[in-house]
Amino acid sequence: MNFWDQRFSESGFKYGTEPNAFLRMEAGRLSAASRVLVPGDGEGRNGVWLAGQGHAVTSVDNSSVGLQKAQTLAAEKGVTLTTTLVDLADWSPAPASVDAVVLIYVHLPGSFRLRAHRALAAGLKPGGWLILEAFHPLQLQHASGGPKDVDMLYTPEQLTEELAGLLQPAQAWQGETNLSEGPGHQGLAHVTRWLGQRI
């Protein structure tokens, strides 16, 4: 059982069942019935919400426990969600296969982050959107969630550089926000929000 299987084996939903606030704000950019990929969707709160908005959603994660809970949540909400067990260290979507990629608090180590981010961006069709929210390095000053390894925290500038040539930035912001996302994300946080459109 891996780290995330253990975490998601706890009762309830670690990050709640409601979608991320930034995703909710920006999802209007998506065309009706978009094909959406949600890597690192865990227990499914974001993928299930997107499916409820009428999109065709595939949630991928390396936790079978999380994906089982995602399917349970989808059934409770009366929506269809495709789930696939993958490891982002060596997995890539088919090129130009989806209309949007949603990365919400998916913190990858530097050893494969660049490869994974560029592979996910390449999975977007021309004009497709990447919607990303993650903890910024200044999150280390807060106790509201996230990894304690600065190598796994993202700045807007870093993302813009990593995705150059694939995505045109539409928003690259960092600052403080109050999180209320289940017991796992609570309180004042310093986050990075990044939006990009496939070139």
Describe each PLM feature range.
Residues 1-31, 138:
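Conserved class I S-adenosyl-L-methionine
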Residues 63-65:
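Conserved SAM/SAH-binding beta-strand->alpha-helix loop
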Residues 76-89:
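Conserved SAM-binding strand-loop segment of SAM-dependent methyltransferases
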Residues 89-100:
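A short acidic, Gly/Pro-enriched loop at the edge of an enzyme's catalytic core
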Residues 99-114:
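A short SAM/SAH-binding and catalytic strip from SAM-dependent methyltransferases
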Residues 114-126:
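A short glycine-rich, Lys/Arg-flanked "PGG" loop and its adjoining helix->strand segment in the class I
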Residues 127-135:
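Conserved beta-strand signature within the Rossmann-like core of class I S-adenosyl-L-methionine
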Residues 151-173:
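Short alpha-helix
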